[in-house]
């Protein structure tokens, strides 16, 4: 099941089109958009396609420009950064092992939650400023215990260790808390995110209960609140 409401229809169509492209057959969807489609916790607007193999940057960039009218903003040895139909698309070689089976849901190839979670921990370790990375870990902990995430992290990135991941999760001085997160359901306060991360580090085997209100629940709650307000404004019975 995919939470398609987390991604604009045009973006979702573009993801499928890119992943059907034979030139991009070695790439898989990762990052926040993959997590949003799997978890349904927030909206996401970017497309991150990663491979664990080298690729010809010049050839792929040229193909994207011709086939998709991509506006390529920059390239690296193993990376392309571009916009397609105003959607930011990053195409990168991430040369670390894919540890779990690649999943295909509704034509979309994605890495496992464990693999993406390990990549999120690595991102926080080296750039702990992005609020959405902490939000994503908060939501992942409703599905996978931190112990499993850090074990995968350490296996994928053998030069780091679990303690480094714990330290990164608990260091928040660089987090840009003013960044806007478009949550699905209720907004999650920063203090609640911090509390969960702290508890997860202490109790690594915990899987946390979801504190989010799903859209259907939210609609039902609003209706109940309106009914309650109407009842509260009735005049006295005579």
Segments predicted by a language model, with ranges:
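Compositionally biased terminal segments of proteins
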Residues: 1-238
